Amino acid sequence: MGRTVYTGRFSAPREEDEAIAREALEAVGLTRLADRPYTQISGGEGQLVMIARALAQKTPVIVMDEPTAHLDFKHEMVVLETMVHMVRDNGLSILMATHFPNHAFYFENKGLKVRVALMHEQEFLQIGSPSQVLNEANINVLYGIESRLITCQIDENHFIRQLVPIGARAGIQEGERP
């Protein structure tokens, strides 16, 4: 399960490591796949295995590079919810690189403390909460598309915020192919 930092490169896994690996698989809902080769699971399950490997390290911070890339909607939601539980249940901090600004709103909508650092041309454009940073002007600079920030009030204490591109061909110029 990738705990060689604790066990050494050539030593056999200890019972403690096996228990930690099982616990990590349980945390991401994949105990049923514990004995299946990695090459025989889906992309979404593979992402969850990678998250389980990170959890097994027992570190306070986990770095994730586009953890929902190439996933279908169902597995994207499973990965995002798993990340929410990692923060809430384990007190972890997650540093995540993503090209999807709505992921930050997703975590903010779940009540998590979220900080966003927007980068443009290898410079930090702005750092702050999703509501401060992910605005229409910044999205236009970053992606070259017009968008609108939609806020929907669910009840007196809960809002959902999401950036929506304007038009079906948002960002595609006349004569360009999608």
PLM segments and residue spans:
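H-loop/switch region of ABC-family ATPase nucleotide-binding domains
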Residues: 98-99
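H-loop (His-switch) and adjacent beta-strand-loop-beta switch element
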Residues: 107-130
